[in-house]
Amino acid sequence: MASENMTPQDYIGHHLNNLQLDLRTFSLVDPQNPPATFWTINIDSMFFSVVLGLLFLVLFRSVAKKATSGVPGKFQTAIELVIGFVNGSVKDMYHGKSKLIAPLALTIFVWVFLMNLMDLLPIDLLPYIAEHVLGLPALRVVPSADVNVTLSMALGVFILILFYNIKMKGIGGFTKELTLQPFNHWAFIPVNLILEGVSLLSKPVSLGLRLFGNMYAGELIFILIAGLLPWWSQWILNVPWAIFHILIITLQAFIFMVLTIVYLSMASEEH
C-alpha cells in the first residue's frame, strides 16, 4: 500500500530504485540524488541473486543426499520431475556430447525461476522492512527485473558459445564460419563478417533483454496496481495478474534455458 506521504508518481519511482553502492566511496547512493557515474553496483540485485542461487544448491543437494530407492516424498518427487523435464529438453535439443549442458540447463531454469518468483511477494513487504528496520534508502527484490543481471547471465552464455565454437571447430574453422558464410568468396569477407557478427552478438543481447523486459513489465504492473488503486480494491486486479504471472515467470525461465541449449547446440555442430 502506498505511503500517505507519497504521491503515486513518488511511490512508483521509489519502488523502481535499486539499492546502489558507489564503488569510489563505498557508500550507499541516495536514490533521490544518484551520481552520474559508472562506478555503482546494484547490491540488492547481487544479494538476492546469490541468496537464491545458494538456495537452489542447498535444496537440490539436500534432496540428492536423502534420495532413496523407495517411495519418494512430495518434495523429492517435485525435484525429480524438474530434473527429468530439463534432462529431456537437453536430449531433444542438444545433439553434441558434453557433461556440462544438462547441469547448466538445470541451473539456469531453476535459478531464473526463483529470481522471477520474487515478483509474487507483496510489493511493499521487503522494501518496508529494509527502509524501516534496516534503514536502507531503497530495495528491489526481483533480480531478473534488473537489466544488469539478465545481461550478465547472457554474457556468460555468450562466452560459452564462443568456447564451444572454438572447441568444436578450432580457431580456423570458427574464423571461416564468420568470414565465408553466407557468401563463400573472399571478396565478401567484410560483408560476411558484419552479417555473422551481428547474428552472433544478437543472441546474448536478445536473450538478456527478453527476460528483463518481461520481468520489468510484470513488476511495473504490480507497482502500478499498488500505487494507483485504493488498498481495498487492489486484490481485484492483483489476484488475476498474480495467477497469470505464475505462467509468465515459468515460461521466461523455460525460454532462457531453451535458447541457451539451442545456442550451445548450434555452436557445437561441426561443419
Swiss-Prot record:
HAMAP family: ATP_synth_a_bact. GO terms for cellular component: plasma membrane; proton-transporting ATP synthase complex. This is ATP synthase subunit a. GO terms for biological process: proton motive force-driven plasma membrane ATP synthesis. It is found in: Cell inner membrane. Keywords: ATP synthesis, Cell inner membrane, Cell membrane, CF(0), Hydrogen ion transport, Ion transport, Membrane, Transmembrane, Transmembrane helix, Transport. Belongs to the ATPase A chain family. Key component of the proton channel; it plays a direct role in the translocation of protons across the membrane. GO terms for molecular function: proton-transporting ATP synthase activity, rotational mechanism. It is a multi-pass membrane protein. The chain crosses the membrane at residues 40-60, 100-120, 146-166, 220-240, 242-262. NCBIfam families: ATP_synt_6_or_A (TIGR01131), PRK05815.1-1 (NF004477). F-type ATPases have 2 components, CF(1) - the catalytic core - and CF(0) - the membrane proton channel. CF(1) has five subunits: alpha(3), beta(3), gamma(1), delta(1), epsilon(1). CF(0) has three main subunits: a(1), b(2) and c(9-12). The alpha and beta chains form an alternating ring which encloses part of the gamma chain. CF(1) is attached to CF(0) by a central stalk formed by the gamma and epsilon chains, while a peripheral stalk is formed by the delta and b chains. Its main location: membrane. InterPro entries: ATP_syn_F0_a_bact/chloroplast (IPR045082), ATP_synth_F0_asu (IPR000568), ATP_synth_F0_asu_AS (IPR023011), F0_ATP_A_sf (IPR035908).
